[in-house]
């Protein structure tokens, strides 16, 4: 039995679930999500819990069991609590602001970088050097946050750029002879 797949999924109050024809629909206070799943697996509700069951111990079913359970659990958590990923800007003059719903960043290029959020994702800028990416779809929020980070990845020598809050950047040592002073005669 899959260690992940056999765990029940708690359904909070205010969240309704419906699984039929290979599509799992979950509706909650923050919105509505649909998750497709393999019809060989069954998703059933038992009181305030959801259970994902597989028909056999075949390799394919074992692989899909844990995956489906995690996708369904992410959808339930997304519509009840939502997901937020925090990013920070490091560098002299690096700052961000909201222009309407779009994120505008000055991150060392000769022009500001503007990123439009896809449907279901919102940006927030609590400080000029911090960006919050939030939404109900965990995969989409993570992908958008990765796309924002990709615009200016942290530099290997100084750590300047866009990074996740708490991310440790392994900095490289500079050139050994870069201490200054007079050159060779």
From Swiss-Prot:
Transmembrane parts of this sequence: none
Record InterPro entries: Ribosomal_uL6-like, Ribosomal_uL6-like_a/b-dom_sf, Ribosomal_uL6_a/b-dom, Ribosomal_uL6_bac-type
GO molecular function: rRNA binding; structural constituent of ribosome
One GO process term, biological-process aspect: cytoplasmic translation
GO cellular component, one term: cytosolic large ribosomal subunit
Superkingdom assignment: Bacteria
Keywords: Ribonucleoprotein, Ribosomal protein, RNA-binding, rRNA-binding
SUPFAM superfamilies: Ribosomal protein L6
Similarity comment: Belongs to the universal ribosomal protein uL6 family.
Functional note: It is located near the subunit interface in the base of the L7/L12 stalk, and near the tRNA binding site of the peptidyltransferase center. This protein binds to the 23S rRNA, and is important in its secondary structure.
Quaternary assembly: Part of the 50S ribosomal subunit.
PANTHER family: 60S/50S RIBOSOMAL PROTEIN L6/L9 (PTHR11655), LARGE RIBOSOMAL SUBUNIT PROTEIN UL6M (PTHR11655:SF14)
Name of the protein in its database record: Large ribosomal subunit protein uL6
Organism: Deinococcus radiodurans (strain ATCC 13939 / DSM 20539 / JCM 16871 / CCUG 27074 / LMG 4051 / NBRC 15346 / NCIMB 9279 / VKM B-1422 / R1)
């Amino acid at each position: 039995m899959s260690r992940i797949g056999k765990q029940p999924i708690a359904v909070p109050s205010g969240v309704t679930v419906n699984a039929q024809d290979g599509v799992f629909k979950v509706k909650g206070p923050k919105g509505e999500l649909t998750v497709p799943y393999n019809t060989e697996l069954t998703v059933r509700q038992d009181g305030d819990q959801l259970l994902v069951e597989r028909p056999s111990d075949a390799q394919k079913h074992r692989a899909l069991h844990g995956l489906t359970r995690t996708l369904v659990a992410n959808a339930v958590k997304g519509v009840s609590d939502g997901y937020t990923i925090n990013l920070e800007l490091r560098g002299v003059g690096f700052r961000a602001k909201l222009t309407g719903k779009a994120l505008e960043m000055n991150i060392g290029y000769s022009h500001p970088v503007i990123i439009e959020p896809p449907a279901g994702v919102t940006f927030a800028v609590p400080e000029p050097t911090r960006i919050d990416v939030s939404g109900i779809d965990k995969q989409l929020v993570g992908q958008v946050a990765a796309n924002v980070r990709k615009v200016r990845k942290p530099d290997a020598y100084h750590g300047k750029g866009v990074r996740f809050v708490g991310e440790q950047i392994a900095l490289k040592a500079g050139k050994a002879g870069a201490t200054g002073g007079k050159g060779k005669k």
